[in-house]
Amino acid sequence: MVAYDEFPIPTADTFSLTGGDAQVYEAAVSIFNRKDCPEYFSEGSSDLILPMLVQYGKYQTDEGNTTYVVNFARCFFFDLGNGLGDMQNPVYTSTCLNNLASITLGKDGALVAFTEAKDGTDDGEFSRFAHEICGPMTDLAEEITAAGGILPEGEHQVPNVNSYEAMVQQYLDYFFEG
């Protein structure tokens, strides 16, 4: 069994990310990982949780920083640590929590700010959050508000995998097969 605290925290290298994708993924991991968000993990579990982003757009701030507007997904792979008898066919159940967010990186690529829409808000309040998160991209804010918070597709996904299964397999191959 691999316990939740024995799964390595992913890096951009885990998914062969480079450039802006690497920077925004490293920021996502710094926001959401088992050390900084222990409330998502339970003692004795064998769960893995990975962040994933669907980028809807990006813009430059007045300060010259880059803000990424994303669907910030927290992907849960339940009981994975007990299902690793065959690394190429791991056994687990999964789900993802999705939320509209913005991640702002400085000119050096370091995390400057993270803003996430609040859960349980009414339509008017969500619209305000969407406009705050989207900044000057008002058409995107309107589209997100009309869709109820999450768009089915974005510009691209980070890491760029075609499924949650592919993401967890790439993670396992990187940390456990090498």
Report the location of each language-model feature:
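N-terminal export/targeting and maturation segments
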Residues: 1-74
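Intrinsic disorder/low-structure terminal segments
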Residues: 6, 14, 113, 174-175
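Proline-rich intrinsically disordered, low-complexity coils
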Residues: 8-10, 38, 51, 90, ...
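Solvent-exposed, acidic/flexible segments
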Residues: 17-25, 94, 98, 123, ...
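Residue-identity detector for glutamine
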Residues: 23, 55, 60, 88, ...
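Mature extracytoplasmic domains of secretory-pathway proteins
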Residues: 48-124
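C-terminal partner/receptor-binding element of secreted or periplasmic proteins
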Residues: 121-178
